[in-house]
């Protein structure tokens, strides 16, 4: 990921540090994540709702072999944390072994996430959330199906002058990572409008923390 440092630094200078990495995992592993996600027993899912938004979440990955391996052997590994630190310049990054708010997520057809900013304090870890990573895993996703991750320079629901900084399509095996700041970045997800036979916009999320 060190080759993404220039992109990260450029976006940071503009006030919105983030990068997009395509073909992040090998195709087979990413497909296994998708199959595991859509076949996970319904009883373990929670539903997040707010102001017309709706997202399904599943973070008990201990019984899911592919997600467990990818999370703890790759995304939480010392090697990956070292790469993140080199790319972002943020030292002392720590993963969350409890996956508070992380893990699988699904946005089904017709759903959105309205503009908001994420929590940046993990009360269980007593740490500040610094980075958010999202890996999109629905195969053959098309840009016109929506579900884009939209970054704003303000909250359009509170500020009529707020504008879109970037809109990123949730293409299969695309990984995006962005820096969390106090009350930011404001982001949303555009309406998911996939065909009826597509399960939805599926992803797996990873959060990273610092002590100060």
Spans of features found by a protein language model:
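A structural signal for short, well-ordered beta-strand segments and their strand-loop junctions
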Residues: 20-21, 46-47, 94-99, 103, ...
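Catalytic core of Fe(II)/2-oxoglutarate
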Residues: 111, 118-129, 139-212
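Generic structural "secondary-structure junction" signal
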Residues: 27, 60, 76, 106-109, ...
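Non-heme Fe(II)/2-oxoglutarate
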Residues: 1-88
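Short, well-ordered beta-to-alpha junction loops that form the rim of enzyme active sites
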Residues: 23-24, 100, 117, 181
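A structural signal for well-ordered alpha-helical scaffolds and beta->alpha junctions
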Residues: 26, 30, 68, 77-81, ...
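Non-heme Fe(II) oxygenase catalytic core, chiefly the N-lobe of the double-stranded beta-helix
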Residues: 38, 74-128, 140, 144
């Amino acid at each position: 990921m060190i080759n993404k440092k220039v992109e990260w630094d450029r976006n940071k200078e503009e006030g919105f540090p983030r990068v997009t990495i395509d073909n992040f995992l090998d195709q087979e592993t990413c497909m296994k994540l998708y199959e595991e996600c859509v076949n996970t027993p319904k009883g373990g899912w929670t539903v997040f709702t707010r102001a017309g938004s709706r997202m399904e979440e599943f973070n008990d990955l201990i019984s899911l072999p592919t997600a467990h391996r990818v999370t703890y052997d790759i995304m939480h590994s010392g090697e990956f944390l070292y790469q993140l630190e080199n790319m972002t310049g943020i030292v002392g990054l720590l993963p969350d072994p409890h996956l508070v708010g992380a893990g699988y997520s699904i946005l089904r057809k017709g759903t959105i996430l309205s503009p908001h900013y994420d929590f940046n304090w993990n009360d269980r870890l007593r740490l500040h959330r610094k980075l958010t990573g999202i890996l999109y895993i629905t195969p053959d996703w098309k840009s016109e199906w929506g579900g884009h991750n939209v970054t704003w320079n303000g909250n359009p629901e509170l500020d009529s002058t707020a504008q879109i900084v970037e809109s990123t399509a949730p293409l299969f095996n695309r990984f995006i990572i962005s820096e969390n700041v106090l009350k930011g970045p404001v982001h949303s997800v555009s309406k998911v409008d996939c065909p009826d036979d597509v399960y939805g916009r599926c992803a797996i999320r990873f959060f990273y923390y610092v002590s100060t």
